[in-house]
Amino acid sequence: MNIIKKIELEQMRLDIPKFKSGDSVKVHMRIVEGEKERIQVFHGNVIRISRGTTNATFTVRKISNGVGVERVFPMHSPFIDRIEVVQQGRVRRSRLYYLRNLKGKAARIKPLKTW
């Protein structure tokens, strides 16, 4: 086995739930401030997933005080405590950049019906 691939497999996290673009997720980040450590939750919709080995990322968008906030998270980051999938969304695209131009109720994502 290639040495680089072996090291990448050791660095990958196996506790990541399956989610896709359009899903509503809560990302629990570990924040270190001086000697203290706390958990900060970022709750929003996944608008983009870039798959790969250890360099996989996903982008989460939320509206905070009327301003759109997007944050890019490395999938296998040691600072991510856990990822919760709150609701699955029904979308037809993998990159939801069009949500940036929508406001209010138009920017909502329909929930996925599971029967």
UniProtKB/Swiss-Prot annotation:
Domain of life of the organism encoding this protein: Bacteria
Gene3D superfamilies assigned: 2.30.30.790
InterPro entries: Ribosomal_bL19, Ribosomal_bL19_CS, Ribosomal_bL19_sf, Translation_prot_SH3-like_sf
Cellular component terms (Gene Ontology): cytosolic large ribosomal subunit
Family of the protein in this entry: Belongs to the bacterial ribosomal protein bL19 family.
Gene from which the chain derives: rplS
One Gene Ontology biological process: translation
Name recorded for this polypeptide: Large ribosomal subunit protein bL19
Keywords per UniProt: Ribonucleoprotein, Ribosomal protein
Organism phylogeny: Bacteria, Pseudomonadati, Thermodesulfobacteriota, Desulfovibrionia, Desulfovibrionales
This protein's record includes keyword DNA-binding: no
GO molecular function: structural constituent of ribosome
Xref: NCBIfam families: rplS_bact (TIGR01024)
Described purpose of this protein according to its UniProt entry: This protein is located at the 30S-50S ribosomal subunit interface and may play a role in the structure and function of the aminoacyl-tRNA binding site.
